[in-house]
């Protein structure tokens, strides 16, 4: 069965973005860019691939489906991108967008848990939960694995990785890797 994987970057204090969805403060070194391109190419938006030496049609390695909330979708939309990950099936969970004018992006206005349960039953690669924090909190019971890119920076405020009710949920670390600037990636599975 497919897994729902929350693959996300965050600050040391647990924020996935700063004010106004800013992620520019994360220190991403060349070694990490190379790792992302080799191991998780599908997590890099289609429009930036040519600018970082990655073929637009580079094959997906882990995920073929993406679920994101409005806060994750809006930055691309603000620069005219209606399909930021054209190389994947894309779902945007939002009750406030109204409609999406792109047939390759499906709007889900209710029941994200039901969506994930249906997708898990389908054949295919794993499902990438890209954010944001509110959606991740709604889907916490369905998250099978966390892949946390922990950057060596404190944000102070912003969008929390999980913005919901108090809900202690155990995950067990299975692997960790570190990059030259101190950024760490930790894989955790539901305990």
What are these regions (language model features)?
Residues 1-191:
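Enzymes that bind and transform nitrogen-containing heteroaromatic metabolites
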């Amino acid at each position: 069965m497919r897994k729902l994987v929350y693959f996300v970057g965050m600050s040391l204090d647990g924020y996935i973005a700063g004010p106004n969805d800013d992620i520019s403060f994360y220190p991403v070194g060349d070694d990490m860019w190379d790792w992302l391109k080799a191991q998780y190419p599908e997590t890099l938006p289609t429009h930036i691939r040519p600018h970082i030496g990655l073929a637009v049609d580079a094959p997906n390695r882990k995920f073929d489906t993406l679920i994101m909330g409005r806060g994750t979708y809006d930055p691309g939309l603000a620069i005219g991108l209606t399909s930021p990950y054209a190389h994947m099936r894309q779902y945007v969970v939002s009750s406030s967008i109204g409609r999406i004018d792109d047939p390759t992006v499906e709007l889900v206005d209710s029941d994200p848990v039901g969506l994930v349960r249906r997708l898990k039953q389908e054949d295919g690669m794993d499902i990438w939960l890209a954010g944001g924090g509110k959606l991740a909190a709604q889907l916490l019971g369905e998250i099978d694995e966390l892949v946390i890119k922990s950057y060596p920076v404190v944000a102070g405020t912003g969008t929390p990785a999980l913005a919901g009710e108090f809900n202690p949920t155990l995950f067990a670390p299975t692997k960790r890797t570190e990059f030259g600037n101190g950024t760490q990636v930790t894989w955790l599975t539901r305990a």
